[in-house]
Amino acid sequence: MSERVEAGQNVIKEYLVLTKPGIVSLVLITTLGGMYLGSRGELQPELVFWTLLGTGLAAAGSAVLNMVIDKDIDKLMVRTSERPLPKGTVDPTKAFIFGITLQVFSLVIMLTFVGVLPALLVALASFSYVILYSLLLKRKSPVATEIGGISGALPPVIGYVAASGSVDINAIALFLLMFMWQPPHFWVLALKYADDYKRAGIPTLPVARGVFITKLKTLLYTASLFPVSLIPYLTGLVENLYFVVAVVMNLIYLGLTLKFFFSKKEESMKLFFFSIIYLAVLFGTMIVDMVK
């Protein structure tokens, strides 16, 4: 009996791994942040619950479907070879059904309890990640990183629109900030795992264009983040504290990126981790310094 229980627990754990809990957590945090900004700090608990549930299920379902699509190349990469599908601990067909089921539940919840527009944005996020990125572009072009950024940029917009009821300049500002942040964040990681991606035949920017072009594009995107990150201040979403913090964080981020660009290093996890701190500080300051 205990062996059955243990086996059942192991199966649950493997299915949980398929949903990429770390990424789902980040999606939920940015969605909640968007809701707080969209509601001007006056969150409705019931709406928050349904929005986070619907968005979380969509993110989890997309992660599962991504793993189903990538099961063959995941076997070839050291970083992903221990995932459930490459290991054979979960049947691909069952995983596919699981992923689709999560997506269906997500759409029903969003349409029933949140609204048509947020539901459409959730569907767009899933489509851009599963179809555009995972299925069509990831194995063919380094542009996949930028296109795939659409899905990662939408969670705060989904939260903002769910709370405010419309897509306005502030929602667009949140989208642009997330969209411009993702490529340089990923490219630094892609440099570290370039051999893994090359072995699997994935044309990430370091594999397809080399280290110099990757470092150059990382620098260009980081520089572009500076003006983009100030849009929430210019639109009146936040006040002076955010402006000061954003300027300081951008100068540090740009300085670290310039240092990396001119160095002989081919990877920089320090820059990768700072990019996470950068985003967290900016979003945190937005919430603290929001105009109510």
UniProtKB/Swiss-Prot annotation:
Its main location: membrane. It catalyses: heme b + (2E,6E)-farnesyl diphosphate + H2O = Fe(II)-heme o + diphosphate. Pathway: Porphyrin-containing compound metabolism; heme O biosynthesis; heme O from protoheme: step 1/1. The keyword Cell inner membrane applies. CDD domains: PT_UbiA_Cox10 (cd13957). The chain crosses the membrane at residues 15-35, 49-69, 104-124, 147-167, 171-191, 218-238, 242-262, 271-291. Pfam families: UbiA. It is found in: Cell inner membrane. Signal peptide: none annotated. Keywords: Cell inner membrane, Cell membrane, Heme biosynthesis, Membrane, Transferase, Transmembrane, Transmembrane helix. It is a multi-pass membrane protein. GO terms for biological process: heme biosynthetic process; heme O biosynthetic process. One of its GO terms (cellular component) is plasma membrane. Its EC number is 2.5.1.141. InterPro entries: Protohaem_IX_farnesylTrfase, UbiA_prenyltransferase, UbiA_prenylTrfase_CS, UbiA_sf. It comes from the Bacteria. One of its GO terms (molecular function) is protoheme IX farnesyltransferase activity. Belongs to the UbiA prenyltransferase family. Protoheme IX farnesyltransferase subfamily. NCBIfam families: cyoE_ctaB, PRK04375.1-2. Carbon 2 of the heme B porphyrin ring is defined according to the Fischer nomenclature. Converts heme B (protoheme IX) to heme O by substitution of the vinyl group on carbon 2 of heme B porphyrin ring with a hydroxyethyl farnesyl side group. This is Protoheme IX farnesyltransferase. It comes from Aquifex aeolicus (strain VF5).
